[in-house]
Amino acid sequence: TACNIATQAIAQIASSQYGGQSISLAHLAPFVQISREKFIKQVAEEFKATGIDAGEDKIKEVAELRVRDEIKRGVQMIQYQVITLMTTNGQAPFVTVFMYLDEVPEGQTREDLALVIEEVLKQRIQGVKNEKGVWITPAFPKLIYVLEEDNIREDSKYWNLTQLAAKCTAKRMVPDYISEKIMKKLKVDKFGEGHCFPCMGCRSFLTPYNDPENDNKPKYYGRFNQGVVTLNLVDVACSSGKDMDKFWKILDERLELCKRALMCRHYRLKGTPSDVAPILWQNGALARLKKGETIDKLLYGDRKSTRLNSSHGKLS
């Protein structure tokens, strides 16, 4: 059920915006324990009804088999629904799935998250069948796997997941990798604490932000980008004719143009009522504003971002 609702939310959110979105498997992991408790109760009742005399250990063993099967079906649902659902823009949702073990507390929840990550990687290695019945690499969801102390060495607890991720990358060119150690050095908040978190969709990384409305706790989920502008550095170089002074002059002109383009996005969004995309602005995907309230207060400060990309290649 959690996986089904997640994919429905993905499709609806994608229909209300441009660009990608990211979800974390850490947010699905707690539901594994709910299923486990349900199956333990269910198996115990079935054994009692059929006259099977089994101890608690055997009941848990059978329940665990059902948990594994439910994880498999849930992950499969996400993969196939994402590539078959169409947004109102007429395309599959651009979604990234984040796999970070340390995002949940150590214990059963982390063990359950590891099970979900393992199943995601196994299914991506297998791929999906196209209309001709051939196993292919799906474009989405994109996968990001975090390298951390628990999975980077052969004697690490979750080394098997990193091996599986490497096998998946060799065959399917995903997942991409984030180093927790390096990212925590680069993404440091105003209190000097480093953080590891997913990019927004394919590539845009947020700056650290501590939410004053929530005891200054770090906030990364539920934030957004106002718009992206790309600067073609190769074109700037070619236009300069190998003259460095001319290169810097052209670059300054292009950067000013990029700034104007980014501000156009900002001014265009000002005054937008939350009613234009209720799932984003009213129902919690990005905020919980009142009906009729404008989104203006979300367009200022560090909660949102604007992005300037640089292109290093040329299209022929």
Features from the language model and the residues they span:
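Conserved catalytic cores of very large enzyme subunits
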Residues: T1-R303, S316
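Single conserved hydrophobic/aromatic residue that forms the stacking wall/gate
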Residues: L308-L315
